[in-house]
C-alpha cells in the first residue's frame, strides 16, 4: 500500500470515528469505562418524571474546587460536563428531605444501606474524608454505587440536581 493510500485511509477512518463519536454524544450515548457500573455502551434517557430513589442516572458533577481535587486524584474522568469532567453514572440513594448518616456505612432515614462501606483511604492509600451527613437539601441528590471503591456521595455529599442528564439505560454492557 502506498504512503498516499495509507494517509487517505487514516484520514477517512479518523473522520468516521469522529462522526460516530459526535453522533453518539448527540444521540445520548455514553461509554462507561469505570467499574462503578457495568462497562460498555449506555444511553441517556430523558427523565419525563421527577427523579426517584433507586433511579440509575447520568449526572454532571458541579465544577468546583472539591471536584477539581477529585479529578487530580484520578477519581473522575475527563468529559463534556462543566470543568471538562465526565458524567457520573450512579444510583439515586436519597432525595431532598431525607436524613443521611455516615459512620462505617451509609444509613438513610435510620435504614442501613447494603454495600455502602465507607473507607478512610482511597485505593492508593491516600486519606479520603467521608461526607459529614445531614439532611439532603432541596435541589440536591445523594448518589451511590454498590462498587466498594466507588467515588460517590458517601465522600462528596449531595450534589445539585441541575446536573442531572437523565436515566442511565444499558445498551451493550458487560461485567469484567
Swiss-Prot record:
Stored InterPro entries: LexA/Signal_pep-like_sf, Peptidase_S26, Peptidase_S26C_TraF
Signal peptide bounds: 1-24
Pfam families (UniProt xref): Peptidase_S26
UniProt function note: Involved in conjugal transfer of the plasmid.
Keyword Signal tagged: yes
Keywords: Conjugation, Periplasm, Plasmid, Signal
NCBIfam families for this protein: PRK13838.1 (NF010412), TraF_Ti (TIGR02771)
Protein name per its UniProtKB record: Conjugal transfer protein TraF
GO annotation terms (biological process): signal peptide processing
